[in-house]
Amino acid sequence: MHPRRPDGFDGLGYRGGARDEQGFGGAFPARSFSTGSDLGHWVTTPPDIPGSRNLHWGEKSPPYGVPTTSTPYEGPTEEPFSSGGGGSVQGQSSEQLNRFAGFGIGLASLFTENVLAHPCIVLRRQCQVNYHAQHYHLTPFTVINIMYSFNKTQGPRALWKGMGSTFIVQGVTLGAEGIISEFTPLPREVLHKWSPKQIGEHLLLKSLTYVVAMPFYSASLIETVQSEIIRDNTGILECVKEGIGRVIGMGVPHSKRLLPLLSLIFPTVLHGVLHYIISSVIQKFVLLILKRKTYNSHLAESTSPVQSMLDAYFPELIANFAASLCSDVILYPLETVLHRLHIQGTRTIIDNTDLGYEVLPINTQYEGMRDCINTIRQEEGVFGFYKGFGAVIIQYTLHAAVLQITKIIYSTLLQNNI
């Protein structure tokens, strides 16, 4: 119940250097910038990407080329312009490559987390809500086998269903957070000089955001676990329609076992806030370690331009990866309980994750969060909370592989252009 991408990575929105304002060249006198501080008044960084993993609690990326002295673990910075004519051309070429690399790295990260990982998310959720299952799929080997069976019997759509609704949930979450923060004094970001009151208000904003997005998250969950065998061809906005219908009590008829939204608020907000806190702490901790390691390596020996550019992007990507992995693993049992509560009473038909074919109904009768936890522990054991965990292993293995491949491609491009 959280944006898959926490706030902070502004790779897609990175701008370096100056822009050519040709349309206004004749109306205003030319300005000369003698120092990096003069340039800082005119060259600014754009806002962070909505939905990105900015878990720095108020940190913003500095303008390109402007040295930063507040962080002791940063490496040496480069001046944006050179005095010589040939150096200026080379600097512009390096700047264009740097901007292209930032866009490519950000795009690869977005693609991995929201597209490439979606089949793993689909199977993981189906295993979590399947209380009938005898095979828990705790290892990636059984998960790959069942993925192949689903693809063979139902086609590729069986593993990519509901992807559009996940983007809608992210959009609703971001929009709700922005609107609430605009009309209330609740801070959207926490500054370095924080106070307990500011932290509490920030977490309250997150909680209200999760409450607003909760019915749409429930509708998206149904789309991702509903069997493709009996699935109708629904539009991309079906998630919005079902979410609104869930709030006003209209739409698809549900059974009497459907839990009211009020009883789902606590587990939904608990999972979302804990996921955000764990991700924030781990991301901050890992990023601090990586920056300190980079700073020490710069002091020990001279660093190549290729390594310097890699150090500008990849520490934050690695920190985001570690934060997302740890929070998903730690909160996996709570996520299983949350999904079972959301799916109960919706008359959803899921695929049989034991056989790879046939379908199964969801007929649980949990009275609430505590009853769900006790029932899973008694009937399925402790490992019942970890059904489908092998899909998480596959998901983050793919993510790590894409990060490594992106780093290799980026290093090759830099070596050929420097």
From Swiss-Prot:
Localisation per UniProt entry: Mitochondrion outer membrane
Solcar repeat positions: 96-187, 311-413
MF (Gene Ontology): protein-containing complex binding
Effect caused by changing G249D: In HMSN6B; uncertain significance; no effect on protein abundance
Impact noted for substituting L138R: In HMSN6B; uncertain significance
Cellular component aspect of the GO annotation: mitochondrial outer membrane; mitochondrion
Residues the record lists as Phosphothreonine modifications: T45
Phosphoserine PTM sites in chain numbering: S32
Listed transmembrane segments: 103-123, 167-187, 202-222, 258-278, 314-334, 382-402
Outcome reported for the amino acid change (mutating E335D): In HMSN6B; uncertain significance; slightly decreased protein abundance
Job of this protein: Transmembrane protein of the mitochondrial outer membrane that controls mitochondrial organization. May regulate the assembly of the MICOS (mitochondrial contact site and cristae organizing system) complex which is essential to the biogenesis and dynamics of mitochondrial cristae, the inwards folds of the inner mitochondrial membrane. Through its interaction with the EMC (endoplasmic reticulum membrane protein complex), could regulate mitochondrial lipid homeostasis and thereby mitochondrial fission.
Illness association: Neuropathy, hereditary motor and sensory, 6B, with optic atrophy: An autosomal recessive neurologic disorder characterized by early-onset optic atrophy, progressive visual loss, and peripheral sensorimotor neuropathy manifesting as axonal Charcot-Marie-Tooth disease, with variable age at onset and severity. Charcot-Marie-Tooth disease is a disorder of the peripheral nervous system, characterized by progressive weakness and atrophy, initially of the peroneal muscles and later of the distal muscles of the arms.
Quaternary structure and partners: Associates with the mitochondrial contact site and cristae organizing system (MICOS) complex. May associate with the endoplasmic reticulum membrane protein complex (EMC).
UniProt name for this protein: Mitochondrial outer membrane protein SLC25A46
Organism: Homo sapiens (Human)
Underlying gene: SLC25A46
